[in-house]
Design a protein with these regions (language model features):
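Residue-level detector of intrinsically disordered terminal segments
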Residues: 1-5, 15
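N-terminal secretory signal peptides and thylakoid transit peptides that target proteins
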Residues: 9-37
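A short aromatic-anchored loop/beta-hairpin motif
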Residues: 27, 35-40, 47-150
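Beta-strand elements within well-structured catalytic alpha/beta cores of enzymes
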Residues: 56-61, 90-95, 181, 202-215, ...
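Flexible, glycine/proline-enriched loop segments at strand-loop-helix junctions
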Residues: 64-66, 125-133, 154, 182-189, ...
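Long, well-ordered alpha-helical scaffolding segments within enzyme catalytic domains
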Residues: 74-84, 190-205
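Internal, conserved structured core segments that host functional sites
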Residues: 139-193
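Surface-exposed, charge/polar-rich loops and edge strands
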Residues: 177, 185-187, 198-208, 215-311
């Protein structure tokens, strides 16, 4: 899959993001996927053991890549959260930074590479490697679980910063297998929620389903230099985050899928790339599972760092 590095001020642009792997992924996978998909689906779907309990679902507001290096309230909460969660057999990550068009991909690598999909940051950030193994067998389980659309296995991606910058704090030993699922950016919000519903079956196989994005994300409207804090610097950001929190409290999934109707949505979700991972997590959570707030607050004034656990 062809990749390009992006400056963080551009990494929420759909035009830029969809070029990440579009040529290689769509030409070699989506356009010629039939034979590949049939071959993959014919493989054994053996999982890596049966867990003693159903795994939770989590959503993480990942914010800036610099959080990988930071020691702040957000990263300290991630570190503590990793110790509270039951140990998974594997992690399936749906990151805002792997977008595709017309197809959904899943990483099949034995050893997924660490992707530094950003620019303009200190060398120390580019030096980070998160050497978690992949899990092709459970990736094949994901192919079989998703009924909404064909899912194509691919070797052409890895772990982008939406995944590894948070896992570095959650699971610093990088000893839990990780694989990613792409977001088909041509599809509406209801589609992403429905795919999340399909992915719920993996929870019973020991998989921790993780969405990584931000429920409020508009890089052109951030207030850089604003200290991290509990409240947003702009009313539209606070209003939308509060609306999401209220809908979660009542598990009003319908309102969260129809997010455009929530207060401040036009600015808070100027592009939906960072909101869609939240819908995968919401869908993978049972409708009766309470949403537990793990962390809430804002970085750069308007980036919601809200983190949620279901189950």
């Amino acid at each position: 899959m062809t990749m390009m590095k992006m400056h963080p001020s551009e990494d929420s642009s759909p035009a830029m993001q969809t070029e990440l792997g579009r040529r290689g992924f769509l030409m070699s996978s989506a356009l010629g996927a039939t034979a590949t998909l049939a071959a993959l689906c014919s493989l054994s779907n053996a999982a890596a053991g049966t867990p003693g309990r159903r795994l939770p679902v989590i959503f993480i507001g990942h914010g800036s890549p610099m959080n990988a290096l930071a020691d702040n309230a957000f990263t300290r909460r991630l570190a503590a959260w990793g110790k509270e969660l039951p140990r998974p057999s594997a992690i399936l990550s749906v990151s805002a930074h792997w977008l595709s068009r017309g197809a959904t991909g899943v990483g099949m690598q034995e050893r997924p590479k660490t992707i530094h999909d950003f620019g303009g940051f200190p060398q120390a950030l580019f030096d980070i490697d998160y050497p978690a193994p992949g899990h092709p067998a459970l990736a094949r389980e994901a192919i079989g679980a998703v009924k909404q659309t064909p899912v194509v296995g691919t070797q052409q991606w890895g772990l982008d910063h939406g995944t590894w910058t948070v896992l570095k704090h959650l699971y610093p030993k990088a000893d839990i297998p990780v694989f990613q699922l792409s977001i088909d950016y041509d599809k509406p919000a209801a589609f992403h929620y429905a795919v999340g519903r399909d992915l719920a079956a993996l929870r019973d196989k020991g998989v921790l389903v993780m969405g990584s994005g931000n429920v409020v994300h508009n890089l052109r409207a951030t207030d850089r230099g604003t200290p991290d804090g509990p409240a947003a610097s702009r009313p539209w950001a606070q209003g939308f985050d509060d609306a999401v929190k209220a809908a979660l409290a009542g598990r009003d999934d319908r309102a969260l899928v129809a997010y455009e109707k929530l207060e401040g949505a036009a600015t808070a979700v100027a592009t939906p790339d960072h909101y869609f991972p939240f819908l995968y997590a919401l869908g993978a959570a049972g409708s009766n599972e309470r949403a537990k707030t793990i962390y809430e607050g804002f970085q750069s004034g308007t980036l919601s760092m809200r983190c949620i656990q279901f189950g």
